[in-house]
């Protein structure tokens, strides 16, 4: 089974002996995750904007229908 304590000691030792190599490796490992997060955030923002636009369109339509019904009654 994986010995987490030994692995953690190895990582700490590696970070102490070669900090630039360690940071480079960590940054390279995390970059795809940051990019995926940015893309998903952008897509979510676009979806929210589209939903809000659609809701405004429906609200405007309902207002126009109500206005037409009022004019029809008069």
Curated annotation (Swiss-Prot):
Family in the record: Belongs to the SMIM15 family.
Sorted UniProt keywords: Coiled coil, Membrane, Transmembrane, Transmembrane helix
Pfam families according to UniProt: UPF0542 (PF15086)
Record's keyword annotation contains Nucleus: no
Biological source species: Mus musculus
Location within or outside the cell: Membrane
Domain of life: Eukaryota
Chain segments annotated as coiled-coil in the UniProt record: 42-74
Positions with biased composition (Basic and acidic residues): 55-66
TM ranges: 20-40
Membrane topology, record value: Single-pass membrane protein
UniProt keyword Nucleotidyltransferase, yes or no: no
Region (Disordered): 55-74
Identification of the protein by name: Small integral membrane protein 15
GO CC aspect terms: membrane
């Amino acid at each position: 089974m994986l010995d987490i304590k030994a692995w953690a000691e190895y990582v700490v030792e590696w970070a102490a002996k070669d900090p630039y190599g360690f940071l480079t490796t960590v940054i390279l490992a995390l970059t795809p995750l940051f990019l995926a997060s940015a893309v998903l955030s952008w897509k979510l923002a676009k979806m929210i904007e589209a939903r809000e636009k659609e809701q405004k369109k429906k609200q405007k339509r309902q207002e126009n229908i109500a206005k037409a019904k009022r004019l029809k009654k008069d």
